[in-house]
């Protein structure tokens, strides 16, 4: 005896193909709260779970070699609300929870400003030999797939 459940199979007829619904997105990653201020963490930055605010503060402090002073007793409470009140204690807290000074890259902005080297530009120029080879490949493709070339908008030199 067959069970009450029926098994449906997908038809191979192109008329009956229905696009499948998009796959559900994976659940968002949940990180431990920021080790520095307990705000919502955006991931592991410089070795610890950290929020965007503490990540940026630590990076800027290290890249600019900042030296801060505490106007109290060097034991200020650092949390989501108070984290911007004392930069000295916030940076100390970053180090206490394990943020790594060595993980901060100092060369990211420098790379953007470097001029493109002349030898790189020259290597991008197409030689006559490569130009000829490209044209031969294009023509061979056109002869092999003439119906595609009639579409016009999908080819560059039709």
Swiss-Prot record:
Pfam families the UniProt entry points to: zf-C4 (PF00105)
Bias (Low complexity) ranges: 1-18
Swiss-Prot/TrEMBL GO biological process terms: cellular response to corticotropin-releasing hormone stimulus; retinoic acid receptor signaling pathway
InterPro entries according to UniProt: NR_DBD_RAR, Nucl_hrmn_rcpt_lig-bd, Retinoic_acid_rcpt, Znf_hrmn_rcpt, Znf_NHR/GATA
Domain of life: Eukaryota
Coiled coil: none
Segments of the chain annotated as binding DNA: 31-106
Gene Ontology MF annotations: nuclear glucocorticoid receptor binding; nuclear receptor activity; RNA polymerase II cis-regulatory region sequence-specific DNA binding; zinc ion binding
GO terms for cellular component: nucleus; transcription regulator complex
Family: Belongs to the nuclear hormone receptor family. NR1 subfamily.
Name recorded for this polypeptide: Retinoic acid receptor beta
The organism's taxonomic lineage, starting at the top: Eukaryota, Metazoa, Chordata, Craniata, Vertebrata
């Amino acid at each position: 005896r067959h069970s009450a459940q029926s098994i449906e199979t997908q038809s191979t007829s192109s008329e009956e193909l229905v696009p499948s619904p998009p796959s559900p997105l994976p659940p968002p990653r949940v990180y431990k709260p920021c080790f520095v201020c307990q705000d919502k963490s955006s991931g592991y930055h410089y070795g610890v779970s950290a929020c965007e605010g503490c990540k940026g503060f630590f990076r800027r402090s290290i890249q600019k070699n900042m030296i801060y002073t505490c106007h109290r007793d060097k034991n200020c409470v650092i949390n989501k609300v108070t984290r911007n009140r004392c930069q000295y204690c916030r940076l100390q807290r970053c180090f206490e929870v394990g943020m790594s000074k060595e993980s901060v890259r100092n060369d990211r902005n420098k790379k953007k400003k470097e001029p493109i080297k002349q030898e790189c530009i020259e290597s991008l120029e197409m030689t006559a030999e490569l130009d000829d080879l490209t044209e031969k490949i294009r023509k061979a493709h056109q002869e092999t797939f003439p119906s595609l070339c009639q579409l016009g908008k999908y080819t560059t030199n039709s």
